[in-house]
Swiss-Prot record:
Full protein name: Cytochrome b
Cofactor binding remark: Binds 2 heme b groups non-covalently.
Signal sequence region: none
Organism superkingdom: Eukaryota
Residues bound to heme b b566: H97, H196
Amino acid sequence: MTNIRKSHPLIKIINNSFIDLPAPSNISSWWNFGSLLGICLGLQIITGLFLAMHYTSDTATAFNSVTHICRDVNYGWILRYLHANGASMFFICLYLHVGRGLYYGSYIYSETWNIGIILLFAVMATAFMGYVLPWGQMSFWGATVITNLLSAIPYIGTELVQWIWGGFSVDKATLTRFFAFHFLLPFIISAMVMVHLLFLHETGSNNPTGIPSNMDMIPFHPYYTIKDILGLLIMLTVLLALVLFSPDLLGDPDNYIPANPLNTPPHIKPEWYFLFAYAILRSIPNKLGGVLALVLSILILAIIPLLHTSKQRSMTFRPMSQCLFWLLTANLLTLTWIGGQPVEQPYIIIGQLASILYFTTILILMPLLSTLENHLLKW
């Protein structure tokens, strides 16, 4: 008799995806982040579901309902902070996952890569709408500023913004629809994750050398299940340390002030994981130009497969490209820092230089250096 795990219509899909899946024998811990992202998504959906049971999406009661969750609901405080800091862990894993893809040339699998970019946009949209829900000062003003950027779109901009707001300002209708979409999107993301995995399993995983590993594969279970559990334990340790010791470390104190349309906070800024894009937006003195740069800062990932000029897939054996990759990483950290600073010198010029360097590195320096490396290796 065949093993049920290999014959049952449903279980065999799970078996072929997570148990008997052939995986390269040499993939490093950088390949852990996919499973960590799946766990983050599951955690966010579960904590979010329980929070939604007690939250009210009305401007008069939203702020108080979050306070009620923290004070009166059994373990409500841990649900709320797991959800808020879980989002931070989600983005740390996301950025490391994308960085891994860039470093090891995983973008050559273009279907998987493109679905990944759409997933990144969807997660960013979900996180933005979630930040609006507690209805604190930064929630309200963040929603106002970011949605207002759409008014830069020629001809339809103003109407589009008012259509999204459901009125002439961010108000009751905006909060209700943001809650509806914030609840819905994670389930759409879950479906897209399945498509992401479907395309990945068509080609199989890449590996640190960038060389096909079809002749040297091992089963996913037990080797990589155990390896993923180690990654999970490390992530959970960091998350629980954040939640239990300093839950507000990554948040903004202004969000503990109820939303007040008549009082603007001195520095409007998004959560830390959007600061690099916010810095790029602010570095361009023109509204439409800034919005375009903001979108392109993420959308640029879509053309990276076209900019791959190297004869090697991975950066493992390309020390010059490695230097450029770490320069890009340092540049993104600089942009993140600048995004949280007030709009004054020297921050303005640093932000502008870092923004120029970001696009220059990806669009010009990386392809040129890859070509130079080919010549140096006489390829």
